């Protein structure tokens, strides 16, 4: 049974790979069709396109890394191969996390209501704010790449002195853990920002509901519904990313103790985040949801 586990986990990852490519590809396709037909596209739709493309890249990177780790482990001690695999993961994961966080900030600035002059200033210039944040995240990306490159250089310097390349797997796993730790520390910033956006959206919704009660209005007014939908999208991102973060932590421990089964399980669960969260974005967006239901109805009718 234990020998069959790698094959089972591989099948699950392939299924997640297919779901992720279909859901993210659907987001890109529908928005691009709308862009061509209307000659314009809203800021949130542009964010969704870039986020979906980054997730497609991340899913492909995870799948390639998975198969290389199972069948061509020697590539990870090659200087060029090691840098390509790790840097591609860093870049795709960086844009995946930060674009989802920027989407949370966009919902906050567009939907929430606060009387603070600073908030109103940002709200009136939301498109410029989003662009500046996106450009500012490149600083984190470059710092992350520099730090990881130092880890890689130290690793290669140690083992280039060993002409036989008979390295210890425990040493390589220690190197892998240090790399994952660095990447995760850089990932905490977007998660924290998204969590703050979530709390501010809740506070704004609470104030809005209190105002509606004072005016003797129901809770199903349009603004309440918009608040609720935005909260669902942000909290789904937080929950999915929290599970992804826990899987990374567990994979660290499993690598240190050389527990292959736990490591593969954590990696498989971790892929669920970029693969499935985009499907929730489709359901939370009126245009994408309508297009999805239309396609699903046509597919069902042909059965």
Swiss-Prot record:
Alphabetical list of InterPro entries matching this protein: TAS2R
Xref: CDD domains: 7tm_TAS2R13
GO molecular function: bitter taste receptor activity; G protein-coupled receptor activity
Keyword Transmembrane helix belongs to the record: yes
Main location: membrane
Pfam families in alphabetical order: TAS2R
Function: Receptor that may play a role in the perception of bitterness and is gustducin-linked. May play a role in sensing the chemical composition of the gastrointestinal content. The activity of this receptor may stimulate alpha gustducin, mediate PLC-beta-2 activation and lead to the gating of TRPM5.
Family: Belongs to the G-protein coupled receptor T2R family.
UniProt xrefs under PANTHER family: TASTE RECEPTOR TYPE 2 (PTHR11394), TASTE RECEPTOR TYPE 2 MEMBER 13 (PTHR11394:SF28)
Record's protein name: Taste receptor type 2 member 13
């Amino acid at each position: 049974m234990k020998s069959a586990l790698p094959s089972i986990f591989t099948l699950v990852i392939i299924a997640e790979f297919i779901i992720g490519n279909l859901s993210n590809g659907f987001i890109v396709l529908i928005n691009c069709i709308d862009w061509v037909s209307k000659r314009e596209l809203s800021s949130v739709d542009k964010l969704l396109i870039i986020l979906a493309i980054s997730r497609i890249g991340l899913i492909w990177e995870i799948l390639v890394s998975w198969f290389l780790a199972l069948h061509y482990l020697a590539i990870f001690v090659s200087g060029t191969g090691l840098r390509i695999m790790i840097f591609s993961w860093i870049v795709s994961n960086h844009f995946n996390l930060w674009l989802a966080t920027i989407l949370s900030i966009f919902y906050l600035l567009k939907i929430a209501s606060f009387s603070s002059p600073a908030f109103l200033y940002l709200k009136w210039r939301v498109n410029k704010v989003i662009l500046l944040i996106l450009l500012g995240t490149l600083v984190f990306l470059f710092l992350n790449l520099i730090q990881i490159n130092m880890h890689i250089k130290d690793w290669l310097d140690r083992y280039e002195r060993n002409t036989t390349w008979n390295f210890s797997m425990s040493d390589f796993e220690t190197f892998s853990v240090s790399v994952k730790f660095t990447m995760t520390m850089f990932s905490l910033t977007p998660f924290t920002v998204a969590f703050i956006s979530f709390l501010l959206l809740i506070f704004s919704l609470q104030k809005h509901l209190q105002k509606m009660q004072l005016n003797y209005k129901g809770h199903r007014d349009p603004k309440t519904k918009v608040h609720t939908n935005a909260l669902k999208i942000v909290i789904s991102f937080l929950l999915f990313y929290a599970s992804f973060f826990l899987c990374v932590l567990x994979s660290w421990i499993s690598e240190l103790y050389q527990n292959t089964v736990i490591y593969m399980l954590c990696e498989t669960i971790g892929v669920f985040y970029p693969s499935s969260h985009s499907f929730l974005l489709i359901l939370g967006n009126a245009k994408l949801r309508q297009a999805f239901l239309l396609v699903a109805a046509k597919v069902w009718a042909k059965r």
